[in-house]
Every structure is written in structure tokens, then in C-alpha cells.
Regions:
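Repeated loop/turn-to-beta-strand initiation elements of outer-membrane beta-barrel proteins
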Residues: 39-45, 73-79, 110-115, 146-151, ...
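Outer-membrane beta-barrel proteins
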Residues: 37-39, 71-73, 105-109, 138-146, ...
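Outer-membrane beta-barrel "beta-signal"
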Residues: 68, 103, 176, 201-213
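Membrane-embedded beta-strands of outer-membrane beta-barrel proteins
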Residues: 31, 63-65, 101-103, 136-138, ...
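Start-of-domain marker
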Residues: 21-78, 87
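Bacterial Sec-dependent N-terminal signal peptides
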Residues: 1-25, 213
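Transmembrane beta-strands of outer-membrane beta-barrel pores
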Residues: 47-53, 81-87, 107, 121-125, ...
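Residues that define the transmembrane beta-barrel architecture of outer-membrane proteins
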Residues: 25-27, 59-61, 95-99, 130-134, ...
Length: 213
């Protein structure tokens, strides 16, 4: 447990202090529908849009389908597919596919603090060119007494065999249930790139809507 807490704060510190060459402000939006299909198994369909260049141009649009199964109260696993449209600087569109598998672990640190770890193995690319990436995300949630607000922090690294860790994300988020089956989350994220031409630091505002069918 202590190792996990130290890892969260270490990665958060590293991602906030990393040096990069270019900056951009982006906004990300997503809407997801969740449906229980059988016992302990949910289907999630998610669509998202991302804007770049100070949120003035399209960067990415995607549709994601995921099946997640609960193994026990702490461990879950999932498989998913994402179809992605990407716009380059000249606004030319290219398509990518992503296939991924997740393993989740969650537990409580105390009565009001809980943590979660997500390990993701993904392969993404074009028809003949795919790249394998390991992503590990650490999240810490706090249950505020007598309120429905749900604050959280998270940090995630991206690792490839060729480059090692080539991307770090740090996120602060605040969730709120708008209705019984409708949740909203607003987040601020900083993303750093490494070992690429013209590495960027992205400052991101993200809005999410999730509805349970």
C-alpha cells in the first residue's frame, strides 16, 4: 500500500516538473453509455472529440466499445476496441484502430480515501503498422462528507519497448451525479511527451457525461 501511494506522488511530481519544448491548450469531450449485459459484466460505448491549437481545430474523434467484468470486489478486467479519426496540421484525416485489455485493482486506504490501479496493454495503428504500449494509471479518490462531489487525482505513464516511458499524464478531476443514472465529471490534465520530434506539453480541460441504461 505504501509503495502505491509513493508511486502516485512520485509520478505526479515528475509529470508536473518535466521539461518540454512546445505547449498547447486542448479541450476533450466524451459521452458514454453503460449497460449491464449479464451478472458482473457491463458493456460501455463511448464517443469523444478532442480539439487542439488552443481548442480551435479538430485533433481526434473516436468511438470506443468495451466489455468489463468484475472478478471480485477489488479486481476487474476488460477488453475493448477503439476506432479513431485523427487530423494532422494540414487537417488531413487518417484512421487508426486500437485493441486493448485492462486489469483493474481498487481498495481503500481509509474510510474516505480509496485508490485504484489500471494496467492496460494496447496495440494501436494503421492497417499494417501497429505499436504496442503499456499504460499504468494510479488514481486516488476522496469521499467528502455530506456531499455528492467526488474529487480525485490520477497519474498515468505510457511505456513502449522502443522508447521506454514516452508520455506522462497528471489529472485533477471533480465528479458529480446530475441524476440517478447520469454522472458528470470535469477534469484538468497536464500531458508531457518524451522521445519524439517536437515534444509537447498539453494543458487539457475535459468534460465527461456517463449514463447508465
Amino acid at each position: 500500500m505504501r509503495i502505491i501511494k509513493n508511486s502516485i506522488f512520485l509520478l505526479l511530481f515528475c509529470s508536473l516538473s518535466a521539461f518540454t519544448q512546445e505547449n498547447d491548450f486542448q479541450t476533450w469531450y466524451s459521452v458514454s453509455l453503460n449497460k449491464k449485459i449479464i451478472k458482473k459484466t457491463n458493456l460501455t460505448v463511448k464517443t469523444g472529440l478532442r480539439l487542439r491549437e488552443n481548442s480551435s481545430l479538430y485533433a481526434k474523434q473516436f468511438t470506443d466499445v468495451k466489455i468489463k467484468r468484475k472478478y471480485n470486489k477489488r479486481i476487474s478486467y476488460a477488453v475493448g476496441y477503439r476506432y479513431i479519426n485523427r487530423w494532422d496540421i494540414a487537417l488531413n484525416i487518417s484512421n487508426q484502430n486500437r485493441f486493448y485489455a485492462d486489469v483493474y485493482y481498487k481498495n481503500k486506504l481509509s474510510k474516505r480515501f480509496s485508490y485504484a490501479v489500471r494496467n492496460r496493454w494496447q496495440t494501436q495503428g494503421y492497417l499494417y503498422e501497429y505499436k504496442m504500449t503499456l499504460r499504468q494509471k494510479f488514481a486516488l479518490d476522496y469521499n467528502i462528507r455530506k456531499t455528492k462531489l467526488a474529487p480525485s487525482i490520477a497519474t498515468e505513464y505510457f511505456l513502449t519497448l522502443e522508447d521506454g516511458i514516452n508520455k506522462l499524464r497528471s489529472t485533477i478531476a471533480l465528479g458529480y451525479p446530475l441524476a440517478k443514472k447520469l454522472d458528470f465529471e470535469l477534469a484538468y490534465r497536464i500531458q508531457h511527451e518524451f522521445y519524439v520530434n517536437n515534444p509537447e506539453t498539453l494543458f487539457i480541460f475535459e468534460g465527461k457525461l456517463a449514463y447508465d441504461l
